[in-house]
């Protein structure tokens, strides 16, 4: 059964405040998203299995622990999810990176899949799907659907900000997926944006409107 984790780490909350601030410029916004992604990745990888190996320090031989050969994959939902990838790869540089392209139909607010590119060994990998926002929940559900349809067995979802009621929608659709969130906000407005949120994450990351 999947779980929902909301991070209350002071560094994450501090940086998230400046990510939200409308006066934060594109360069600083990118850097902050990258930093928060790294901090969240530290927590999300807490359950990685370890195995013992023998090494030799400058002083003596010793038994030490390393990650037990786990294959990981990071899957950003285009385009805003790209801003979180490098922060995660700083901690797990051997992870493969795939991409899922979804856009939200402005009329129906439902996701439309337009691009999927994944590592060839999908069934063997533990995947982390990343997207700064979990608003309606439609994109998260569609991205998880896309991975499962192609054989993925182990999936986690990670976002910066989520709307409370919509987290439940993802849980209901995919009860086996753990969800990791930096902040739960108040609600969605009539246009499907999270309030207070941070605006359009893609536009703020890439300097577009």
Curated annotation (Swiss-Prot):
The keyword Transferase applies. One of its GO terms (biological process) is uracil salvage. It comes from the Bacteria. Its EC number is 2.4.2.9. It is an enzyme of class 2 (transferase). Uracil binds at residues 194, 199-201. Allosterically activated by GTP. 5-phospho-alpha-D-ribose 1-diphosphate binds at residues 79, 104, 131-139, 200. It catalyses: UMP + diphosphate = 5-phospho-alpha-D-ribose 1-diphosphate + uracil. One of its GO terms (molecular function) is magnesium ion binding. Pfam families: UPRTase (PF14681). InterPro entries: PRibTrfase_dom, PRTase-like, Upp_B, UPRTase/APRTase, Ura_phspho_trans. Pathway: Pyrimidine metabolism; UMP biosynthesis via salvage pathway; UMP from uracil: step 1/1. NCBIfam families: PRK00129.1, upp. Homodimer. Belongs to the UPRTase family. Catalyzes the conversion of uracil and 5-phospho-alpha-D-ribose 1-diphosphate (PRPP) to UMP and diphosphate. This is Uracil phosphoribosyltransferase. It comes from Bacillus caldolyticus. The lineage of its organism: Bacteria, Bacillati, Bacillota, Bacilli, Bacillales.
């Amino acid at each position: 059964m999947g779980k929902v984790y909301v991070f209350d780490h002071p560094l994450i909350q501090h940086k998230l405040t400046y990510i939200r601030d409308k006066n934060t410029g594109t360069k600083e916004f990118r850097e902050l998203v990258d930093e928060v992604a790294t901090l969240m990745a530290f927590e999300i990888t807490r359950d990685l299995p370890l195995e013992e190996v023998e090494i030799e320090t400058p002083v003596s031989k010793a038994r030490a622990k390393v990650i037990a050969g786990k294959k990981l994959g990071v899957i950003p939902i285009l385009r805003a999810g790209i801003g979180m990838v490098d922060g995660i790869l700083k901690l797990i540089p051997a992870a493969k990176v795939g991409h899922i392209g979804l856009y939200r139909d402005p009329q129906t607010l439902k996701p439309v899949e337009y691009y999927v590119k994944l590592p060839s060994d999908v069934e063997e990998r533990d995947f982390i799907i990343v997207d700064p926002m979990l608003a309606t929940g439609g994109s998260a559900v569609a991205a998880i659907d896309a991975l499962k349809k192609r054989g993925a067995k182990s999936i986690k979802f990670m976002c910066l900000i989520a709307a409370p009621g919509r987290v439940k929608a993802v849980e209901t659709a995919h009860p086996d997926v753990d969800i990791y969130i930096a902040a739960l906000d108040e609600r969605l407005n009539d246009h499907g944006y999270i309030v207070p949120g941070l605006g359009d994450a893609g536009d703020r990351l890439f300097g577009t409107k």
